[in-house]
């Protein structure tokens, strides 16, 4: 009897061990996103046949169904999410995407992760064809080997980074708002993947879609891990953290001027503050979607409303431009800086959070400017080095002569990132003193400027190109700032390119607020034309921020009609550039984005 008891006890212990082992394995699978953890969504296939759609995600017949609004049956369908996509890229240069959670859903409880997952799923179903076009354009230009695929080392870096993020979410999302929010961003990405893979369009893998949505970070990573050895020189440095070979890339066209122009203007009568951004990029990426997301989360029983509008592109969960307006009345943008000191890349490690993720996490959590830059600074990936600008419109009262007619402290913060460091500061006093803030791809902080290697570049011709105070855009912004007295003036400034007669442009279409690399000639730029330059402008103001709205234009600048519109057929140089789905000619007008419910 005793022996039988011991035998029973041993068998019981063994069964408990096996059960715990299985649970452990299941948990490990869960943290890496076993897709079975998300609800199945039945998609009405007719959605894929229309370029513009209004759809509902409904709970009916004991399952989630994605249907056209016209198919909605009030008696049987409980609306969970609303999605709208209007593809006007051929007529205005923009698609418009609006995804909203219905908090009044009556028959089923929706978790935060499901909300986020549904958001990504709906986006990829509505924009799947554009996502496929965007990825093919991106891969054809960014991956220079014969089959246009990323290098194995790049894939390894991103897989390791994604694993790190999912690990941290799994271990900390119950106690940390940061990792809870990160988990929601990753659930949105999972929805994007699953929604796209359920579509009839040519398949893209999870890592391909992760590469696409990480396009900003890849500006650094494709340099560190080139897909073709022909793009790198013979010198390399060792990354001490992961034994990564860093290619010493000779500065190419884009390295010289990087991305974007930003400008903030306080009107002299204190009636408004304009917040404007002009994106610079290669023209193959001129597939633009303005997005609005309206979700309602809870962290530890505390409401965490997530409302954000932003300029973006197909397959991007973030902006990448970057330009955001949040429900907390924050306006956020960035311009990109270079790294000329390659030793800094030892701090570019996969055990980190990518820039696109950190920006969206900060958008989700931050209620003021100082919080935004603080949250963004955590888990620095050392990729996509930017100057971030955050303006808190809650602290601006139009026409009210506040003490000394100035913005209060903490209204305007900036953050400048390099590998291994993010420097932040409240620069409201500078904005008050100047009446404006200018940003143009050169670090503001002297310490960041020096350690990045800019100071050594000033000895190279043209020396002005690397000077914070003397580069063309700095001088143009300072000269033209006082001319901005109304919204039309601001629109003109953000599209400004008068290179033919402006002495500050040195006769080059690159040297202005919205550059036109396609207008380069041997005479004016000592190089051939290239399909790169300013591709849009977005401007918001006090009243627009209240409804997460802005005014935007898509396409290379015509400077109010004095420059020819860009067209792909204007040069044989552009004919071999893959630009699927991109309009042939860009001659669009300004568009109103919003208002969106706030």
From Swiss-Prot:
InterPro entries: PLipase_B-like. GO terms for molecular function: phospholipase activity. The keyword Chloroplast does not apply. Its EC number is 3.1.1.-. Keywords: Glycoprotein, Hydrolase, Lipid degradation, Lipid metabolism, Secreted, Signal. Residues 1-24 form the signal peptide. One of its GO terms (cellular component) is extracellular region. One of its GO terms (biological process) is phosphatidylethanolamine catabolic process. It is found in: Secreted. It is an enzyme of class 3 (hydrolase). Glycans are attached at residues 50, 98, 173, 341, 368, 450, 480, 526, 576. Its main location: secreted. It comes from the Eukaryota. Belongs to the phospholipase B-like family. Probable phospholipase. This is Phospholipase B-like protein G. It comes from Dictyostelium discoideum (Social amoeba). The gene is plbG.
